[in-house]
């Protein structure tokens, strides 16, 4: 029976309640917390996650299709190269222990080669990783990052598009199936109670079947 490595990335931290964040940080299995850089208590949350053995990413707001507001400090396609790079440096400074960046929204920005070149250049200069959340099939980010020899990853599944414990548990089993076939898998969830309860229930059961939970940087790019 084959198992594999699983990285679970939890998005949108920093904007929610501190109580739920503390409970995610208390999970025994290593998680990767993607923290919005311009929300309150970002530094405290990042320090706590790191101290508890979890990995930290900057969850960088990026421009989506359709005009929805991605949040303060977002990267957009109408910014010049200098401004894009300034915003990335600023975001990285705000989140201690960050091992890289993932995109928050960003269906427009991640499809733009010029924009992504600036993002990836900043990461390469610092030996940081990029996770493409794949909010659009048109994203060029992952392929560009691989071509530039960055450590880059892309998600296999969103875990909690349906905010229901049983639905999320089923997605975790699906994710394990991918890891069993491919040797590794990346699942993205969010800082929600149903997600926390599903992880608490399913992760120990997957561990008994030989699956290993690791920070995202421990996967093969």
Segments from the language model and where they lie:
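Glycine-rich anion/phosphate-binding loops
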Residues: 38-44, 77-86
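Structured catalytic-domain cores with a bias toward divalent-metal coordination
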Residues: 173-176, 183
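A generic structural motif
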Residues: 35-36, 60-61, 210-221
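Structural preference for beta-strand elements that scaffold enzyme active sites
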Residues: 5-7, 30-34, 55-57, 98-102, ...
């Amino acid at each position: 029976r084959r198992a594999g490595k699983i990285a679970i990335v939890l998005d949108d931290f920093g904007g929610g309640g501190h109580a739920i964040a503390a409970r995610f940080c208390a999970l025994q299995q290593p998680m990767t917390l993607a923290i919005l850089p311009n929300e309150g208590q970002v530094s405290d949350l990042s320090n706590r996650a790191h101290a508890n053995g979890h990995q930290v990413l900057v969850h960088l707001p990026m421009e989506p299709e359709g005009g929805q507001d991605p949040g303060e400090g977002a990267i957009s396609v109408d910014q010049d190269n200098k401004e894009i790079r300034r915003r990335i440096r600023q975001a990285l400074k705000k989140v201690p222990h960050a091992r890289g960046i993932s995109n928050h929204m960003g269906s427009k920005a991640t499809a733009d080669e010029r924009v992504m070149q600036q993002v990836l250049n900043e990461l390469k200069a610092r030996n940081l990783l990029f996770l493409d959340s794949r909010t659009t099939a048109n994203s060029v980010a992952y392929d560009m990052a691989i071509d530039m020899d960055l450590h880059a990853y892309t998600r296999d599944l969103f875990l909690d598009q349906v905010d229901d414990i049983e639905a999320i548990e089923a997605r975790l089993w699906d994710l394990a199936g991918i890891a069993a076939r491919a040797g590794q898998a990346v699942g993205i969830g969010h800082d929600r109670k149903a997600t926390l309860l599903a992880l608490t229930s399913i992760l120990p059961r997957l561990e008994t079947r030989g699956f290993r939970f690791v920070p995202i940087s421990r996967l093969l790019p």
